[in-house]
Amino acid sequence: MKQRKFFGTDGIRGRVGAGKMTPELALKLGWAAGRVLSRNGTQKVIIGKDTRISGYLFESALEAGLSAAGLNVLLLGPMPTPAVAYLTRTFRAEAGVVISASHNPYYDNGIKFFSTDGSKLDDAIELEIEAELEKPLVCVESHLLGKARRIEDAAGRYIEYCKGNFPADQTLEGLKIVVDCAHGATYHIAPNVFRELGADVIAIGDKPDGLNINDKVGATSMAKICETVLAEKADLGIALDGDGDRIMMVNRHGEVVDGDQILYILAVDAQKRGILKGGVVGTLMSNLGLDLALQALDIPFVRSKVGDRYVMEMLRENEWRIGGENSGHILNLDHGTTGDGIVAGILVLAAMRRQNASLEQLTEPMKMLPQVLVNVRFEGDSNPLDTDAVKSAQADVELQLGARGRVLLRKSGTEPLIRVMVEGDDHPQVLAHANRIADAVKAAC
């Protein structure tokens, strides 16, 4: 397949005002996408964004480009990524566009597309859009220009959809839940969803100012929610990331429940109910403890490359329904077409109610092996993973760990980082091994 020039593993992403993330490119991208998408269907596209201050800039540029190509635009304003996927389906739009850099800091932003069925855009269509980007922008005739309007009830529609994933004969009454919205796109949605299902909700990270998204809050910064769960004597906590497609949880003891443990809960619940279709897809980063726990229940488990795109591909290939990443991207294809943090939280709460169990009781059978992840920043085109020193350090650590451990080195698909992951039985040993390999990577950068 032809190499993509603009689109990465999750759309286009980068520092605002530099590289690809400029208003000029956003305008041209809107036009190019419009040219490709206008060949069929409804001639309308949905745009949603997270709470970054630069979202206004890119929303306007994309709107102008799409209109110049003759497509009508439906503007959602701040809206979680999975909400854009859902509303793209329900409005029967040609595509959905999300302006977000997910868990990245406010000074980054990104643009990604959903197809008309709410799934990520096919590689072939992205390549068609890239081909159009190489052409000069030519506006359609004035009478063919697209129009734009805001969808005022978008949040309400999505809230009702989320609630519909919880059993109609159950409520969350009696549960105290801390909900961390990461000052992101779920700030006006997630607390309301859980309140309307009956929970006593304490919301944090729910006051976005355009600059504070993911800043010491949310699914990538768990200290605040762990402290709040303990201080408020809450039953559990739910932490979402800036665009709402990731979830991490916290039990009543202030202990983090990650994506691997959430996958375990959902798989076991589905097995108990006789609705588990096949097995579970994790990634190369999934904890070995998940693999072993599912093996004990005769639930098949396979690993994809890192990235929810690859988890989805493997789910479709195997015709399975449940998969995800330890970082909190959870896919349940019986409940949506993309990772949805709010819905994943609802499904865990439903399992708690059905089994009359606490969050810690549901995760107790799964024994997590100590896992250490060290990120090493690098610049330039060279690949430090190809050096003899790094390969030697990795081989030596793997020899010492044996069958009860793993080493994984990989480049991030969204940031200039080398990720060093080491897993084994003994945490101090695992930490020492990870730092040793990370030092070798740093020296090679």
From Swiss-Prot:
| Residues that coordinate or bind Mg(2+) | 102, 241, 243, 245
The domain of life is Bacteria
Catalyzed reaction equations = alpha-D-glucosamine 1-phosphate = D-glucosamine 6-phosphate
Annotated signal sequence range: none
InterPro entries in the cross-refs: A-D-PHexomutase_a/b/a-I, A-D-PHexomutase_a/b/a-I/II/III, A-D-PHexomutase_a/b/a-II, A-D-PHexomutase_a/b/a-III, A-D-PHexomutase_C, A-D-PHexomutase_C_sf, A-D-PHexomutase_CS, Alpha-D-phosphohexomutase_SF
Gene name, please?
glmM1
What's the protein called, per UniProt?
Phosphoglucosamine mutase 1
Cited function: Catalyzes the conversion of glucosamine-6-phosphate to glucosamine-1-phosphate.
